[in-house]
Amino acid sequence: RSITEQILQHPGETFDVSPFVDGRCKTPIEEIQAAVDGAISKEQAAKLRQCLNHIDELEIHKAEIEREIFRLSDKYECVLNLVRTVPGFDKNPLTAIQVLSEIGGDMSVFPTAKNLVSWAGCCPRNDQSNHKIKSTRISRAGSYFKPVLVQVANALIKSKKHPEFTTRYRRIKAHRGHKKAIIAICRMILTAIWHILTDLKPYTPEGFLESRPVKKEKVLT
C-alpha cells in the first residue's frame, strides 16, 4: 500500500522501493522496482484511489464485526481464557473464539477426546475390505474448523518453546511426510483442548505428557 500511495502522490517520478518493502516480502526487490517504473495515466490513478478507498471501507467494516464478536463472547471469557492457554491460541484472540464457536464449551457432548477429534475430521478413515486397507485419508468433516487447526499447527512446529509438539512432528514427518505430521499435531491440539475444557484446568505440557501411557521397556532373554 505504501508503494501505491507513493505512486499516487508523485506520479511519473522514479523512486527506490526498498524503504517501502516489508522484510517478509518474498518477491525480489528488483522485480518490484521494474513493476513500478514508468508513468500512470489520470484514469489509472483514479482507479487506484478507488481501490484504496474500498480497502479502507472494508477495514472499517471488519473492525465493526470484530467488536461485535468480542461483545458476544464476553460471557464465555472464562472458557476462552482456558483455550488461550493452549500453545498457538495466545496471540490472536479471535482464534480461540473461532474454535469455541465450533466445538462449544460443554465437552459432555464428546464422551472422549477421540470423539472430538473424529468430529473435527482429523481422524484417519479405516476403509478396509477383506483385510485390504483401501484408504486411510482423513474425513471431509470440519471443513471450516480444520483449516484453523492446521494454521495453528504450522505455527507451532516453528516454535522452540513447545518441544512436546515439535518433537512429535519431526518424528512423524520422518517416515510419513509433512501433511500427516501436521494432522497429528492437530489431534494433539484438540486432545489438549478437550482435557482442559473437561477438567477446567489450564494447559500444561507436563500434564499432556503425563496423560500419555509410558511404554514398558522390553527385555530380551
Residue ranges and their predicted role:
Residues 1-221:
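A detector of single, family-specific signature residues
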